[in-house]
Amino acid sequence: MGFLTKIVDGNKREIKRLSKQADKVISLEEEMSILTDEEIRNKTKAFQERLQAEEDVSKQDKILEEILPEAFALVREGAKRVFNMTPYPVQIMGGIAIHNGDISEMRTGEGKTLTATMPTYLNALAGRGVHVITVNEYLASSQSEEMAELYNFLGLSVGLNLNSLSTEQKREAYNADITYSTNNELGFDYLRDNMVNYSEERVMRPLHFAIIDEVDSILIDEARTPLIISGEAEKSTSLYTQANVFAKMLKAEDDYNYDEKTKSVQLTDQGADKAERMFKLDNLYDLKNVDIITHINTALRANYTLQRDVDYMVVDGEVLIVDQFTGRTMPGRRFSEGLHQAIEAKEGVQIQNESKTMASITFQNYFRMYNKLAGMTGTAKTEEEEFRNIYNMTVTQIPTNRPVQREDRPDLIFISQKGKFDAVVEDVVEKHKKGQPILLGTVAVETSEYISQLLKKRGVRHDVLNAKNHEREAEIVSTAGQKGAVTIATNMAGRGTDIKLGEGVEELGGLAVIGTERHESRRIDDQLRGRSGRQGDRGESRFYLSLQDELMVRFGSERLQKMMGRLGMDDSTPIESKMVSRAVESAQKRVEGNNFDARKRILEYDEVLRKQREIIYGERNNIIDSESSSELVITMIRSTLDRAISYYVNEELEEIDYAPFINFVEDVFLHEGEVKEDEIKGKDREDIFDTVWAKIEKAYEAQKANIPDQFNEFERMILLRSIDGRWTDHIDTMDQLRQGIHLRSYGQQNPLRDYQNEGHQLFDTMMVNIEEDVSKYILKSIITVDDDIERDKAKEYQGQHVSAEDGKEKVKPQPVVKDNHIGRNDPCPCGSGKKYKNCCGK
């Protein structure tokens, strides 16, 4: 309890501090009101000049603190003149919390959009760009259009970054003082910027300050979603079909175990025996069978943990993911690690080819790259530990402008779902008779449709808002607070949209929110409740539960069922028990804890690739931004030669076989016969290096003489292609390592430590391969020039669920590389995808 008291006291102290700062802002109201419009814009210019004259970010931060009261007061005056709205003291407090890099928790209807204008304006003055991030393009467009009036009045520019924009339009949007965008588009633009070949193809500036609307949705609910830019991999889909056939043959408990609490499924020993017989294996868990085990486990998940119309829907032969937090389908998105293909096999639709990852990043790692990160939402306090541990953000609960008048009634618990739904319908009919608007919240599409059928039988007119008819969302939400309105919504009672009460509804008790089941996250329940009682309106909320609900089943409702039976309670009699409500909340906390642990575990694994990604992207950017790459190329060639001598020339042996070393030199650096054994025989390693290096230098200068004006361009192209090719292969290898690493725990090994160690070794090997590739292609290519060849564009790699059109840019002439020698480990030119030595070079 001491810890909780500290949190509560801490919030009170913070509110007191913010309140004092807000008073300073309000005290400047009169001073600002006498300024002309032009004088207001001149103030903005003066702030900008003062800040932008200082290049040191920490010194800029001090200036921002000094000018905060005046800048916030200026925005208040601007809002008054442009919108005829003056931000309340609580909105100023919320704005200061956001400026401090924290999360401002503000209830629904408290005006988060207007709150964000003050810290956005203040931080945009530094000229480094502020990103205002929303969950979808509709909100980004509407907010940017609305708020641009205010920012333009104050003298700042506003950009809107959409998926459909060209490269030039995107760059323009990012160069504005304030940029509105979705989280997806930002992540993909970052990845694409790190796949370009020329600096002028980049669209983003360095990541400075981001304000995330609905921050819990993006940083918690979407944290595990990787953004992936991918190309198609040439892998057969037949194993998905075989694994699906196998999974459907299995019997629960005999062949596999399903854990309700963790939603995990795994084969029993008997199931493993069946797998060995079907796939003709000696030992299913042998490491060489990782691919088969992975496909079997994926088929088990698809068949026994994911439900159609709950986790996904099938529309026109396509599997669409349903977002469990919003109830919306997510067209274009696919489950990763082969799970989407496994569901396609399960549903008998066409199995799409697996894709090969070219670049990827999680939201956790993307957003941690900003110098400063802040957010706002109506529900964040339950996840404060995660925000603090992973993002170093504190949650500040901002008081409401008017007292909350919503009545949150105790849960009603029934024995069966039938009893629960009958009671829900009776409650709806009763309230509907007097005209009170009702919002019914469900956790699944099928539940919303079941309740809809029950209400139709009772003659109650209503709207259904779920993944199947989400296109009417704005229209349905806009009328949900009108007299007599009944709305059934699946986890999606419109984040970012307010339900406003119609005329005469206040007298009827306001909006009644009825939850038909507890969600596994308390935040989603709080969001549903928060639809009612906005800005001091009257309202009420109540949850109806049954012992057959998924959350209750997962966390043991047998004891309660027996207790209710002993009390002689029938299906129509609910209990209203604080003990049961506490048990439900305890179950939710356990699920939230499990989910937090899973996100932390993913972050630990992702940390390995994050560090490697930073090295590779840093190397690429250095190549792109430097005038010449010759120094780097020569360093790579020398390093490759030095390694080869250390490996092949063992000075401790009496007789050294120089043939393997000469073969390597001919394969990578020089042509056949250019190095003879008698030139290096009997020499020490240093002398051998000098002898061979002299010949390599000559070959390098000869290549340079072929295209003196374009040799820099040639080197840059070879470097980027070598890095990109090896990096995409490395991502694929790391993905395979990660999928199979859990098997190590059976051998009493630490999977994470093994992943870190082996990932490090794989990265070192990749860097060696890059240096060898660069050496070979620089020294052994026949070079001609073709002015008509266009640059490689990042758009060649199609985003997994987002892609952007590139602008039409003037193309620099590029060298054409014709390799006159095929190494044994090179891809075979016949196009089989195999190595040359395993194909035509046998």
Curated annotation (Swiss-Prot):
Zn(2+) binds at C828, C830, C839, C840. It is a peripheral membrane protein. ATP binds at Q91, G109, E110, G111, K112, T113, D498. One of its GO terms (cellular component) is cytosol. It holds the Pfam family P-loop_SecA. Its EC number is 7.4.2.8. GO terms for molecular function: ATP binding; metal ion binding; protein-exporting ATPase activity. One of its GO terms (biological process) is protein transport by the Sec complex. InterPro entries: Helicase_ATP-bd, Helicase_C-like, P-loop_NTPase, SEC_C_motif, SecA, SecA_CS, SecA_DEAD, SecA_motor_DEAD. Keywords: ATP-binding, Cell membrane, Cytoplasm, Membrane, Metal-binding, Nucleotide-binding, Protein transport, Translocase, Translocation, Transport, Zinc. Belongs to the SecA family. This is Protein translocase subunit SecA. It comes from Staphylococcus carnosus (strain TM300). The gene is secA.
